[in-house]
């Protein structure tokens, strides 16, 4: 054994050839600060070996290196800029020394090689991969950019266009694509990986492969003519501006850095990467996006722990076809759980099957599946007008009309047709689960399962625990949601549960602004362009459906009369009374026409101004700051109340529900991350200016306490140790 660290070791393989093996405790390898330091020590040992002829890098895990240790990021990002820069220089010196070894090097890459894992193998001369490879640089999705030389080496290896596509979008690619663009040199079966890598290494040692020529381009300026460079970088900057926008500085910073570094050799180019990385790491956007990643891991870990003792349902059923039922049936079947889809009429069943077939055809068109797979999936969805096969199902989700009487009747009837251990769930969006449970003989086997539309796209499923829902019932429903590829978050019961309960105060803020003379077009523009929502409130209401919102608004007002009962006729009432139901009938706040692809495109409609004039004061202008404050305060206050009342268990789960269920702007990180970034005292000062607008603007006492004591909602993070300690971690 030449060297043994906590996460990697170095040993001789055969005469003159050494192997460096990543083998961290636990299931995966991460390129954390300790591993970077250990890698430097191992390379130091190699540099002393006069008889070294070649080096093989490999992993003892199912994946090569999954990336940097993101749990370290928040503390690293608190280190002063100068110290963070010093540490990056140290880390890059390690990869430079790997790249500069006076012998050929090869990485045998299996599974994931992401972020720092990808940057590590870019420093070797050759890369051989297994078919399950996923390799790439996802850093821009975390609000940063590659920091271990990825933005320097990848463009010089692949050319600017392919590298920019991966780096700016934070993409990873599979084995075939990696081979096509030159990111790996070959792909072999897993059992042949080391043997194949050794064969390449021996060819390089014997002079049959010119490893020095392979290495040289990574040390030099990027080989691009002035015209090629102008075209590549202009197109890349245009694409980034269009897709990422101003709220995500990392992608455009990465592109500009690669452009600026193109005319320099490795050392100067790495210095530019360092100078760009450090300021990004100190942005609120990076903290928010890293926070989302960590919250996502927490939520998924919680679901995994919850379901460890239950079996995933093997057969499911959906009550109520149509678009929603068809979407749920498709998602279940697509992920391998056969489903019976029941409705009371053929027309709805046809609509549900058409929806499932349409979604499968999209997968076929994209080349994700072939005709055989399509037929196989669709054959596991069984449409029926009766209860045939219900005695075999493990779980049933009801997705009929949002009416408590209808839902109770359907659930009670279904309970008599299934096994005593079958779980029943309701896809209600607002009706309290404990109220629906009153109709059942086995309420312990019942809970809520709130999907979001469109089901195949929206990652969140709210799992609602009723007063009598058993732990086993919740666990089984969470297991099914996870199997469907969704992110389940368990919440406690109340009208609207969590997501809709906090959404309707946001809509109430919108209605009050319109009542006071604001223009809905400006509100949409401000909330989209300035705050960052994917849709402004008027557009969102049109997508949800004005009729749906009108009904849900009444349910929420009955559930929370002190805050959500209104004493005036609002814009939603006016549009509902005029039969303007939004996208579903082409008329809402906006008018909708289908574009060439059959998608609804919004247009202005002067008629709506006359309708709104009946429920509004004369038009007046509002500042962007006032619009944002009046829209967000009611939502944030309600989010805080939900945490204080135990409707949602943690700030992390609340923020993920908002991001995954409502599209809360990820660069803000969710309501609690936004509050912590803004500061609770500053938020309180802002909210107090609008208390005269009513109970929705009254800040909860718990938040007032946070402001008094200057306490955040997320646990405070300590800065990482000084850079000198990091080096020898």
UniProtKB/Swiss-Prot annotation:
* Binding residues for substrate: 296, 500, 660
The reaction(s) annotated as catalysed by this protein in its Swiss-Prot or TrEMBL entry are: a (3S)-3-hydroxyacyl-CoA + NAD(+) = a 3-oxoacyl-CoA + NADH + H(+); a (3S)-3-hydroxyacyl-CoA = a (2E)-enoyl-CoA + H2O; a 4-saturated-(3S)-3-hydroxyacyl-CoA = a (3E)-enoyl-CoA + H2O; (3S)-3-hydroxybutanoyl-CoA = (3R)-3-hydroxybutanoyl-CoA
For this protein, the record's InterPro entries field holds:
3-OHacyl-CoA_DH_CS, 3-OHacyl-CoA_DH_NAD-bd, 3HC_DH_C, 6-PGluconate_DH-like_C_sf, ClpP/crotonase-like_dom_sf, Enoyl-CoA_hyd/isom_CS, Enoyl-CoA_hydra/iso, FA_oxidation_alpha_subunit
Keywords of the record: Fatty acid metabolism, Isomerase, Lipid degradation, Lipid metabolism, Lyase, Multifunctional enzyme, NAD, Oxidoreductase
Recorded GO molecular functions are: 3-hydroxybutyryl-CoA epimerase activity; delta(3)-delta(2)-enoyl-CoA isomerase activity; enoyl-CoA hydratase activity; long-chain-3-hydroxyacyl-CoA dehydrogenase activity; NAD+ binding
Q: For this chain's UniProt record, which GO biological process terms are given? A: fatty acid beta-oxidation
Tell me the segments the record calls region Enoyl-CoA hydratase/isomerase. Answer: 1-189
Region entry Disordered, spans: 708-729
Q: In which pathway does it act?
A: Lipid metabolism; fatty acid beta-oxidation
Task: Identify which residues the record assigns to the active site.
Answer: 450
Matching CDD domains: crotonase-like
A Gene Ontology cellular component where this protein is annotated is:
fatty acid beta-oxidation multienzyme complex
Q: Which Gene3D superfamilies match?
A: 1.10.1040.50, 2-enoyl-CoA Hydratase, Chain A, domain 1 (3.90.226.10), NAD(P)-binding Rossmann-like Domain (3.40.50.720)
Tell me the residue numbers annotated for binding NAD(+): 324, 343, 400-402, 407, 429, 453
Site (Important for catalytic activity) at 119, 139
Region of interest (3-hydroxyacyl-CoA dehydrogenase), ranges: 311-729
| EC number(s) given by UniProt | 4.2.1.17, 5.1.2.3, 5.3.3.8, 1.1.1.35
State the similarity comment.
Answer: In the N-terminal section; belongs to the enoyl-CoA hydratase/isomerase family. In the C-terminal section; belongs to the 3-hydroxyacyl-CoA dehydrogenase family.
Q: What does this protein do?
A: Involved in the aerobic and anaerobic degradation of long-chain fatty acids via beta-oxidation cycle. Catalyzes the formation of 3-oxoacyl-CoA from enoyl-CoA via L-3-hydroxyacyl-CoA. It can also use D-3-hydroxyacyl-CoA and cis-3-enoyl-CoA as substrate.
Q: Quaternary form?
A: Heterotetramer of two alpha chains (FadB) and two beta chains (FadA).
Question: What is the recorded name of this protein?
Answer: Fatty acid oxidation complex subunit alpha
Species assigned in the record: Escherichia coli O7:K1 (strain IAI39 / ExPEC)
